[in-house]
């Protein structure tokens, strides 16, 4: 399963990797800010300079993936063909390995048959293939790590072993160093298990504290580095105020309109250089909040549009938008269909027992929340795609089982009617 998934993704890489070798804007298409930071690390400049000049330390992105890319650059060269192929191959490997937690999560809750179908669906899952083979970013590693976090959670409520809870905390902290969005759901999942242990009368306090301390232990070196570099506490990454600015401005034709990023326009780039990163982010946060205060009704509307986009892929049918996003119409059908089938599977899981459904509900409620209020990207939902796959498969197989049972009932009724008629 894993080898077939890897082979498919690597085959797609062969067609898509050349676009990352475009030298325009000093190879910006090769991993954007992550590529810049990785280059700075290789040059001995530290974790710094996410844009077009040496601008000093940064917390623009979380550290794990830039460090990984820096390792690739160190071995294969900066912005080389070999580096592009190597990092895309690693992304493909992360995506292929996600088959394992997908299979195990499905098996834990829904049995072997659902697990096999879920694993194989992940092998051929379009989002998984495309983002692994074409997108040099933390996304596929985030997907793998979050799937592992979720898998560990499913076993956590059954144990009070301190080592298991420490493992959960360490894994969650490590995953957050790759993508902080993990922390939008992991604490709530841990709290749910903690509560379940408490209700059952099992040991709960020490395991919970151990998990929290493990998160702190894993993430604190990065926090200490940030405090040393910027003189204030910055957890994981420090550009949340800027993310508000990107999605809350006078342009609503796109979910992330161009012209508001230091990589897009000279004006934003100059402001970043003049104010420094923390000053720039604070300034953009103030601009975003001022806009929101002046346009409260629009902000509510935009928030609702972002909710719809996350779950259906729909933003607009406007000519300008579809010219920018030409594949959105087929994506809307696929994304919406997947969501509907997933919700059917979630409903069936809730009928089986709320204890089964609640971890999924926690993730679906908490994970995308920050994107509703800032701005979404097409890759933001990818880390929870494994849960969509598992529940969608369970929904389809449950529907098939119900239809088969209904058909058998009808056949039995017809046979009984014929038997009664013959007796008469």
Please provide the spans of the model-predicted regions.
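Short helix- or helix-capping micro-motifs
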Residues: 5-8, 115-126, 144, 151, ...
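Extracytosolic helix-loop segments that constitute the early lumenal/periplasmic catalytic or substrate-binding loops
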Residues: 10-23, 29-57, 64, 71, ...
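Loop-to-helix entry region of an early transmembrane alpha helix in multi-pass inner-membrane enzymes
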Residues: 59, 63-67, 77-100, 119, ...
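Membrane-interface anchor segments at the N-terminal boundary of transmembrane helices
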Residues: 81, 86, 93, 291-360
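Transmembrane-helix motifs of polytopic, lipid-linked glycan transferases
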Residues: 86-110, 147-152, 340-344
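Membrane-interface transmembrane helices that cradle and orient dolichyl/undecaprenyl
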Residues: 109-113, 141, 149-167, 175, ...
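Perimembrane helix-loop-helix junctions
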Residues: 155, 185-216, 223, 396, ...
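Membrane-proximal stem/loop segments at transmembrane-domain junctions that anchor or position
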Residues: 227, 233-309
